[in-house]
């Protein structure tokens, strides 16, 4: 459930604020987030496991705005990061580094050093060379690095190939066949402390079976490691739980948690870590855009809008479908439109074959844009990145200013005469 709904006046509201008012105040394109929705989705995970020892580590990559991170930090959230930049964002937003897990296949020595100095919860290590590097950096600092190995369980997540991460052909993690051997190596290195086991098989999963298959494989590995004297303290099941974009029927966090807890009856000493990103942020945000022109040809009707693929790349990159609805629905006969932006690429579209009643100047909302929206945006075609607003009841906060054109080349210089 989210808090973007049509009210009695016929307008689309974010909590207690008409979205049209925000468009008029802050301009378009504009990302709008709902604090109540973010909190509701986070609590859905937190409450689903009851009093079982657990930590919710929000995946910063989904939406890294400081206002979003601070909202979750106030709830007690941990964070899943993949760069030192994301780590510094968490700190700037008031996050607790002791609740941070550091994922990613290419951690640099400088990133490792900074994370160790801040005493993060755990490094999710993805290769043997990374183990050796982390052991070296930790030794130079005179500390032990807490580590978990990201295991690739070779489970087909049955999602888009670009967001599938748990197959042996993917770059992520350590293959299941070699997992025990790499754990032995980690256990033998003097500056590492083996804490956990981790996996993340993909994103936007709409069935429980892949999660459960992966978990069963990890629990079997935990048992075999214990027999060798390697004791695993936490199970990090990653993220990936899907959301409703169109007509998907993803499991609820409560269903997911129940299935996991049923399997953890024999492992009550394991802390459970979740890394949800999309499931918390996606439906907590919309992208508001304006219709600039209606272009009719013999073969197609185009609604040319002021938002483009540089603002929201998911439709172009993943062929993703996101609902696009008017802020003020009109009466009349709908026509079928492709909704396209101003960028000079044929792939610059946010929706195709949408039945809408439109006029130039109308305002539209691209739903489910709170995750992998702004964080994947760019300045392609020298377009300033858009503003972001957080709605909290009847109050609104500009949590990111729209970029000024001059800022786009402020770090550049021309050659001397």
Curated annotation (Swiss-Prot):
Question: Catalyses which reaction?
Answer: meso-2,6-diaminopimelate + H(+) = L-lysine + CO2
Which Enzyme Commission number(s) are on file for it?
4.1.1.20
Gene3D superfamilies documented for this protein: Alanine racemase (3.20.20.10), Lyase, Ornithine Decarboxylase, Chain A, domain 1 (2.40.37.10)
Top-level taxon in the UniProt lineage: Bacteria
Is Lyase one of the keywords?
yes
BP-aspect Gene Ontology terms: lysine biosynthetic process via diaminopimelate
What are its cofactors? pyridoxal 5'-phosphate
Q: How is this protein organized at the quaternary level?
A: Homodimer.
Which PANTHER family does the entry link to? DIAMINOPIMELATE DECARBOXYLASE, GROUP IV DECARBOXYLASE
Q: What is this protein called?
A: Diaminopimelate decarboxylase
What gene does this protein come from? lysA
């Amino acid at each position: 459930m989210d808090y973007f709904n049509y009210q009695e006046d016929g307008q689309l509201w974010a909590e207690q604020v008409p979205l049209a008012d925000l468009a008029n105040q802050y301009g378009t394109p504009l990302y709008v987030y709902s604090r109540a929705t973010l909190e509701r989705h986070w609590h859905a995970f937190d409450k689903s496991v009851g009093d079982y020892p657990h930590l919710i580590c929000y995946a910063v990559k989904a939406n890294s705005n400081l206002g979003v991170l601070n909202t979750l930090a106030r709830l007690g959230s941990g964070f899943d990061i993949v760069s030192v930049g994301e780590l510094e964002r968490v700190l700037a937003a008031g996050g607790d580094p002791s609740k941070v897990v550091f994922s990613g296949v290419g951690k640099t020595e400088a990133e490792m050093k900074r994370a160790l100095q801040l005493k993060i919860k755990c490094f999710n290590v993805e290769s043997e060379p990374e183990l050796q590097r982390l052991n070296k950096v930790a030794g130079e600092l005179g500390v032990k690095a807490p580590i978990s190995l990201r295991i690739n369980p070779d489970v087909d997540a049955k999602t888009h190939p670009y967001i599938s991460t748990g197959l042996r052909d993917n770059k992520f993690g350590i293959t299941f066949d070699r997992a025990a051997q790499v754990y032995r190596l980690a256990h033998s290195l003097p500056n590492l402390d083996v804490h956990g086991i981790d996996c993340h098989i993909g994103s936007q999963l709409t069935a429980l079976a892949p999660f459960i298959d992966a978990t069963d494989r990890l629990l079997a590995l935990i048992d075999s490691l214990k027999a060798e004297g390697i004791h695993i303290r936490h199970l990090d099941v990653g993220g990936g739980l899907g959301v409703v974009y169109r007509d998907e029927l993803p499991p609820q966090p409560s269903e997911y948690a129940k299935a996991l807890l049923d399997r953890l009856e024999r492992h009550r000493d394991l802390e459970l870590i979740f890394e949800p990103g999309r499931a918390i942020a996606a439906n907590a945000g919309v992208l508001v855009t304006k219709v600039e022109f209606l272009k009719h040809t013999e073969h197609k009707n185009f609604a040319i809008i002021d938002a483009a693929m540089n603002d929201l790349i998911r439709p172009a990159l993943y062929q993703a479908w996101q609902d696009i609805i008017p802020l003020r629905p009109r009466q009349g006969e709908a026509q079928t439109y492709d909704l396209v932006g101003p960028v000079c690429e044929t792939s610059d579209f946010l929706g195709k074959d949408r039945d809408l009643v439109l006029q130039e100047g109308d305002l539209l909302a691209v739903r489910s844009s709170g995750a992998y929206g702004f964080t994947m945006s760019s300045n392609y075609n020298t377009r300033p990145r858009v503003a972001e607003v957080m709605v909290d009841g009847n109050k609104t906060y500009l949590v990111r200013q729209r970029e000024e054109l001059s800022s786009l080349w402020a770090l550049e210089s021309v050659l001397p005469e």
